[in-house]
Swiss-Prot record:
This is 2-dehydro-3-deoxyphosphooctonate aldolase. One of its GO terms (biological process) is keto-3-deoxy-D-manno-octulosonic acid biosynthetic process. It is an enzyme of class 2 (transferase). Keywords: Cytoplasm, Lipopolysaccharide biosynthesis, Transferase. It comes from the Bacteria. It is found in: Cytoplasm. It comes from Coxiella burnetii (strain RSA 493 / Nine Mile phase I). It catalyses: D-arabinose 5-phosphate + phosphoenolpyruvate + H2O = 3-deoxy-alpha-D-manno-2-octulosonate-8-phosphate + phosphate. SUPFAM superfamilies: Aldolase. It holds the Pfam family DAHP_synth_1. Its EC number is 2.5.1.55. GO terms for cellular component: cytosol. Its main location: cytoplasm.
């Protein structure tokens, strides 16, 4: 299934596209710098790009953790990125978010993994009419996403993506099953792989989550080789000082070489075709 986002189309047989940015809006300056650098890199690579940042991280491990600037200031910053740099924007929303207010600014709405089974929430987000990236819960089998997508489609909005971000594996650990990417294609939605949250160690540091960012390129390459429409990565100029998800954020300075590799892999895989689609 092909889907239009801003001025480009996404789908399994289209070139790989990127969703990337810092986990949370820390400041206008940082957001503008990261978005500008990502736009420059993706323009050089001729890779479609959607900028991602959150104005409110509602599911932090500790109530003392930084959540973001809030919706008013956050949307103002995201709108500036969109207008100044001319890039499409994606941000996540929650059950108490004024959805229409966010939809008036961004190009894609994203639903958090923890909320993928909240039926009213999924329907409300989809009913906005914007493209939606539904992140699969860490507790959900890939085939269960068909029912989540059906709830969204029931609103009449067919512009739905599904995003794989790992599976809970014991306490404070996630693993990635590459078979899930092929299974998720059966939803008939573009499939995205979140390479950074997939290396997260949820709650692994007690008051915050840990992560193994050294494995980001490993999983990103594997997912691209499996066949996906897009790759999702949170990035930061100095991940060790990031205010949210630093341990699993990929360094901004290393984004270009990783994306160059993924672009080449994507081209080879999609030119060869997907034998599993005719394995029977």
């Amino acid at each position: 299934m092909l889907m239009q986002i801003a001025d480009f189309e996404i789908g399994l047989n289209n070139p790989l596209f990127l969703i990337a940015g810092p986990c949370v809006i820390e400041s206008e300056a940082l957001v503008m710098d990261v978005a500008g650098e990502l736009k420059s890199i993706t323009q050089q690579l001729d890779m479609p790009f959607i900028f991602k940042a959150s104005f409110d991280k509602a599911n932090r491990s500790s109530h003392l953790s930084y959540r973001g600037p809030g919706i008013e200031k956050g949307l103002t910053i995201l709108e500036k990125v969109k207008k100044t740099l001319e890039v499409p924007i994606i941000t996540d929303v929650h059950e108490d978010t004024p959805l229409q207010e966010v939809a008036a600014v961004v190009d894609v709405l994203q639903t958090p993994a923890f909320l993928c089974r909240q039926s009213n929430f999924i329907r409300s987000v989809a009913a906005c009419g914007k493209p939606v990236n539904i992140k699969k819960g860490q507790f959900l089998a890939p085939w269960e996403m068909k029912q989540v997508v059906a709830k969204a489609w029931a609103t009449g909005n067919k512009k739905i993506m599904v995003c794989e971000r790992g599976y809970s594996f014991g306490y404070n650990n996630l693993i990635s099953d590459m078979r899930a990417l092929a299974i998720l294609r059966e939803t008939a939605c573009p499939v995205i792989f979140d390479a950074t949250h997939s290396v997260q160690l949820p709650g692994g540091h007690g008051t915050n989550s840990g992560g193994q960012r050294e494995f980001v390129p490993v999983l990103a390459r594997a997912a691209t080789a499996a066949g996906i429409a897009g790759i999702f990565m949170e990035t930061h100029p100095d991940p060790d000082r990031a205010l949210s998800d630093g341990p699993n954020s990929w360094p901004l300075a290393k984004m270009q070489p990783l994306l160059e590799t993924l672009k080449e892999l994507d081209k080879v895989v999609k030119n060869a075709g997907f034998l599993e689609q005719s394995s029977e």
